[in-house]
Structures are given as C-alpha cells and as structure tokens.
Amino acid sequence: SSFADIEISGIAFHIGSQIKTIEPFTKVFKKTSELIKEINRERQIIKFLDIAGGLGVDYENNIKEFPLNEYVDLIKKFFDVKTLKIILEPGRYISWNAGILVTKVLYIKIHGNKKFIITDCGMNDFMRPALYDGFHKIIPLIEIQSTEKISTDVVGPICETTDKLISSDEFYDVKEGDLLAVLNTGAYGSSMSSNYNVRPLIDEVLISKDTYRIVRKRQTFEESILQETKK
C-alpha cells in the first residue's frame, strides 16, 4: 500500500545454485504463496512467478540428482498453474552433460613427486575450474589401461597459477600429443570463454547422431584483436 503508483505484475526470486534437495524450494514456495495471496487480496493480481535457483547435478558421478517430479508436484501444490504464469530457470540442469571439451597434451613435466600435464586448453577456454574450483572428469580419447599413482596436475598454457583443469592423486599415463576429453562442459563453458591472454576463441562443433556442423569457427589472431585495432 506504500507504493500505490507502482503496478506489481509478477514476483521473481533466486535462492542459489546447485540445489540438490527439495527442502529449500518447499520453504520459499510457502512464503511466496502467502505473499502472492496477500498482494492479490490488497490491490492487484499477480500474473507471473519467476522461479530461480539452479537445479543440482552431480559432476563427479555424471548423474542428475535433483528430484524433478517432486519439484513439479510442489509447484502445483503451492500455486495455481492454470491462472499464474510460471517461469522456470533450471540453469545447468538442461545442458551440463551436452558438452565435451577436447584438448591436446602439449608437454609433460615432472617436478619432484609431482607430474604436470600441460594442455592447449587454457582458463580462457574453460573458466569453471579456475574461477571457483569446478570439478570436471577428464579422460583420454584413446584407451589407456594403466593409471599412474603419482600426484598429477592437468593444467593449461596460461601464465596463471589458477590455470588448472584438475588435480589428481592418480591419473592416466598419457603422453605428448594425446587428446583428452573434459566432460560435462555444456553449461557455462562457452558463455564464460574469453580472449584473455590474447587467445582466440576455440571452435564449437554441434553433433547430432552421426552428423555434425561447426557452429562457431575458431577465431584467427586478427579477429581476436579486432575490437582493439579497428578504426
């Protein structure tokens, strides 16, 4: 009532990311439902509800953890889905396992009891591990039976201590020139990539069954600095 000149047509909320249980939504749905009823009772009709807070996935075991059916039932329990427009923001849940980043082993270095596998994938290409220590499994693209029981860091070529894909106590016995697959990069991989360190954006390939097409061509060096050099 303090804002009589403002028309409230909808409510939006975001309660976090990687939510793996239904309980947080139960609490916020209850409060939001009460708020909608109060607003509708006092002055006007709420037309839409934007529900945000990313649904959780398990990167280590490659499974979707969130109880989606319970989530849908909960929405129906607290809100009139026939009259209220519901907008959902599932986040990484819909695309996280749709992407694989392929990188090449450039060099291998041994320093004391530590092994470093340097790849051509930098933190500019895939930011999640460097930005907030996001975990992604890495596997070789050719079958390798043995794993080495030595502390190993798989890193990128950028001169930053955070340019690291994974740390492992036991990693595959790969060699220079081998290709590695960084799994589950479909969410926030491409959108976070940049030209940091004057590195051109990598190409992206869309695969559907037995066909493929390039949806983003690899930048040339000239294209990567175009905004800084054009007159």
Listing of model-derived features with the role each one plays in the protein:
Residues 1-108, 199:
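Active-site loop/helix belt of alpha/beta enzymes
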Residues 74, 83-231:
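Charged (often Lys/Glu-rich) extended helix/loop segments that serve as interaction or gating elements
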